[in-house]
């Protein structure tokens, strides 16, 4: 199980690019997974995007385009259950496009657990933005909109959901993944 989050130059995966990614969690033997890197998008980062995540053109200079990160990225996500907030609707679309741009096969994951979809399915009261849910569940998100902080928060949020609604999680992870589809 690995948490994934991205920061990008904008919202459209067809025209915008990744500027930071994080993969956090543990593998099947319980050892820690932690990979976080800035990425040179090969274009200028718009000021309105920098205003959200704080990542500047100077920050990413020399970080390598995403195609230079795919080996390490693939090694972690291949066959993994990927957890993230809006990971299906946003993050994985960017990952998919970056692999296509690089002429590479997109890694095959075991499945996704999207904490945004899960919050809606569980009918959690209030807004379902990651920051709002973290406030509700007392999850520290001081560095919101940085990939490592958001990926970690998504994993903790999943754990909080599992503790609050144990009856909804009394099945193998594959069953949980299927109910979110």
Regions from the PLM with identified roles:
Residues 111-113, 173-174:
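Beta-strand segments within the central parallel beta-sheet cores of soluble alpha/beta enzyme folds
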Residues 146-159:
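Acidic, divalent-metal-coordinating active-site segment for phosphoryl/phosphodiester hydrolysis
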Residues 113-121:
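Short, flexible loop segments at boundaries between secondary-structure elements
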Residues 157-181:
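Acidic two-metal-ion nuclease catalytic site recognized across multiple nuclease folds
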Residues 93, 116, 152:
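Active-site phosphate/pyrophosphate-handling residues
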Residues 1-111, 123-145:
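Conserved non-catalytic scaffold segment of RNase H-like nuclease domains
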